[in-house]
């Protein structure tokens, strides 16, 4: 099933790129929480929803662009968790650092994940405890890698005072910044060793990247040391967390 989900992510990426390259208008509007949404978000959402309903008609889907109410999803044990365009701010800035995120959740855990960066044409995927990166038609298994000093990857668009204080206390390290779920993927492929997050995220922002990072050997825990959990709950917000090889 992983190959079909990867192809679905590519199809969604193609729909996004039609807006990104100007073939179709971007049409940026603000949602109720003031976050931006574009025609590309909606186009990718439609592609993924149609594809998953065909691929697995018995598994419900939670997408950022049309999340079901709590009364609908409170008893879900297995479901798809989708962010059709993660990094909308990066998309609007046209820096290429946005992704298509698709994850399969089973009893609170992301057991399959796909993160596709359309501009870079890079696909990260994970299933059955293994993670891969596909680039230029070549697919290879990836895993975490230690480095000294460690490279800490941080958000391009969401810096905060807590993060600054954390980094000051961390000891010797280097930093890099990138948008969207690519932060998880940098840790997964051994380029970075730590991704700390204090600012708010939603479950669709993290599930696919979580699957990839965990399958590559990283730990994805909240600041109390518990694995991020995707068991249905009323709020979509995650706690703060860190993705680490240590």
Curated annotation (Swiss-Prot):
Q: Decide whether keyword Nucleotide-binding is in the record.
A: no
| One Pfam family linked to the record | Inositol_P
For membrane topology, the record states: Peripheral membrane protein
Keyword Cell inner membrane in record: yes
EC numbers:
3.1.3.7
Q: What is its main location?
A: membrane
Q: Which GO terms describe its molecular function?
A: 3'(2'),5'-bisphosphate nucleotidase activity; magnesium ion binding
* Cysteine pairings via disulfide bonds: none
Q: What class of enzyme is it?
A: hydrolase
Q: Name one GO cellular component term.
A: plasma membrane
Keyword annotations of the record: Cell inner membrane, Cell membrane, Hydrolase, Magnesium, Membrane, Metal-binding
Chain sites annotated for binding substrate: 64, 85-88, 205
Q: Name the reaction it catalyses.
A: adenosine 3',5'-bisphosphate + H2O = AMP + phosphate
Residues binding Mg(2+) 1, per UniProt: 64, 83, 85
Family recorded in the similarity comment = Belongs to the inositol monophosphatase superfamily. CysQ family.
Q: What is this protein called?
A: 3'(2'),5'-bisphosphate nucleotidase CysQ
Tell me what organism the protein belongs to: Escherichia coli O6:H1 (strain CFT073 / ATCC 700928 / UPEC)
Report the gene name. cysQ
